[in-house]
Amino acid sequence: MIESLIALIAAIVGLGIGYLVAKKINDAKYEIFVEQAKAKAKAIEYEAELILKDAKNSILNAELEVKKKYEEKTHKIQKDFNQKLDDLFKKEQKLQQEEEKLKEDKEYLCKSQKHIQDLQSDVDKLKNKYQEKLDDVLKILEHSTRLTQNEAKEIILKKVEENSREQIAHIVRKYEEEAKNEAKRKANFIIAQATSRFAGEFAAERLINVINIKNDELKGRIIGKEGRNVKTLEMVLGVDIIIDDTPGAIIVSCFNLYRRAIATKVIELLVEDGRIQPARIEEIHEKVCKEFDSAILEEGEIIVMDLGLNKIHPEIVKLIGKLKYRASYGQNALAHSLEVAHLAGIIAAECGGDENLARRAGILHDIGKALTHDFEGSHVDLGAELCNRYKEHPVVINAIYAHHGHEEATSIESAAVCAADTLSAARPGARREVLEAFLKRVSELEDIAKSKEGIKNAYAINAGREIRIIANAQLVNDDESVLLAKEIAAEIQEKMQYPGEIKVNVIRELRAIEYAK
């Protein structure tokens, strides 16, 4: 029991001693923590003092900077103000000087005006004296000549008028002669300028095309069995095909440039392809016709672009390209129109006209020639009607009429086109009259045949000694073909003059086509 009590007391004493020891240790730690906190607080306080000091320095520097800028700006403003003040002072001095000058001028004007008034007064006095003297002289004259004042005046005026009329007539004749000489000189100068600034190509059309072939064996294939291929070619193409002993050459003859060009291309393609037969001939012909239509439009577009023209209807552009396959007096129509366009532009520019409008009128002045093979009427009327339909400029229409004398030229541009047309046509070697007469005769021959009902097409071949007529098998039978040939022959004999005889050949072919499905 006592031992247990002693153990308990010992435990209590131990706990007490442990508590005291622990408390002392904790008190020591607390004191250390407090000291550390105080040290940190002092460090923070020191840093704060440094920051505050830096802030004060920054504020002071900023104040100094602002004060410096303010002083600089104030100085600049003061300087500008002083400068403006000086300028105003100078202007004020200048105004004062001008004001003084105006005062002096005003005084001078007043003196001058007074002087003029004095002079005017003297002049009036002199006039009065002169009038008095004149009256005295007139009285003396009336008394001596026994003529009144009006009668004397009439005699003097009549004499003056006679003398003046002679002088005026002499002056008018002189200036009229000078004006004519000057106009002639100016016209010659303009024409010389135009012709020297434009160098056109010489373009004379032939009536034949020569196709070169590799060997003469191809001639037999082109002729075909019993001449079937060459007959088909001539009928489809509307040309003469001459195959003779000339080595390596086939000649295509036709007065129509367009048909001749198509025929040449068709034969070249057939020779290149090697398959020469009637069906293939028609197939190639159709293909080439489409290609030529596209090429004609492209040719027209190139011409229009080269001339710097715009807003031309596509149909007119196509017809411009078609002029490449038309000729007049042996001169290519497109080459002639281009020459006229360039010359007209130069002449119009020299005379103060619209160069672009003159070129437009020049290229279109013969546009009707692209239609004469398809429509009745002169190329002048056809061209004017076409341009009127597509709303071309009135100057263009006037130029079309004026270049053949159907109307008077109403503008510089129209007159320039007329002059350029004459220059182009009159150029040595530009045209051939005999060739044009032949072309006119064969065209008339085709027109007579085409005027009959039931005719699909007609081609003048063999230099106009034969007319080949393609009849519509649906409208013309065999008996009517014979009568048709006689009628056409009789009309040709009645209306045309020609050497020898002309063969009228009416061809009627009926094709029946059906497809097995």
Swiss-Prot record:
One GO MF term: RNA binding
Database matches in PROSITE patterns: HD
Pfam family, one: HD
Compartments, record wording: Cell membrane
Cellular component GO terms, alphabetical: plasma membrane
Stated role: Endoribonuclease that initiates mRNA decay.
Family of this protein: Belongs to the RNase Y family.
The protein's name: Ribonuclease Y
Gene: rny
